[in-house]
């Protein structure tokens, strides 16, 4: 009886107050969609302004966008390899930009101060559903990369360099998305909570240094996520000898 009560209580635990959208029998976290649309819309406007008038001598936003392009290209080339990195640049770039914008949106925008009829807004990456979805997308991508480049030979990876590695390699397929999702979720949620508490207690000066620290850690987390995604894809397409 006690165990059932405890399990029910733990199952009911939630981080923050959610804005729910009911579609048939499916209940969605509406705040994730709202903040994602706002941030992605802002990103599209930013990119549109930066590419509106392309010049041979880039300045301003165009210069920043070209820097990001070169950075993502070098990241993909280093982690995935010269042979197929171009095929995966759009995916790695999209992952990096989405996570980066989501993280920075959580650090810069006081979402929780925006009043809703129910629930509260927050960074998309501060919701475990978002980070798990991103991590599963990465897992599907490196499976696809391995199978599309090697065919059935991809499964040789699981017994390389010895068949003893098979259970460990299978276990690794489960730990990769778990570590990706919980690392990102934990860091961004912790940053949001710390800033939120400080804004409530000392609303003027003290939260500012913490916000700058949050911007730094948010950028690092986006870089780590994109780098690991590229590394896993590179590992899947790598030829084992």
Swiss-Prot record:
PROSITE patterns in alphabetical order: ATPASE_A
Entry keyword annotation includes Ion transport: yes
Keyword field: ATP synthesis, CF(0), Hydrogen ion transport, Ion transport, Membrane, Thylakoid, Transmembrane, Transmembrane helix, Transport
Pfam families assigned: ATP-synt_A
Gene3D superfamilies noted in UniProt: ATP synthase, F0 complex, subunit A
Transmembrane intervals: 30-50, 91-111, 128-148, 193-213, 214-234
Oligomeric form and interacting partners: F-type ATPases have 2 components, CF(1) - the catalytic core - and CF(0) - the membrane proton channel. CF(1) has five subunits: alpha(3), beta(3), gamma(1), delta(1), epsilon(1). CF(0) has four main subunits: a, b, b' and c.
Family membership noted in the UniProt record: Belongs to the ATPase A chain family.
Record protein name field: ATP synthase subunit a
Lineage: Bacteria, Bacillati, Cyanobacteriota, Cyanophyceae, Synechococcales
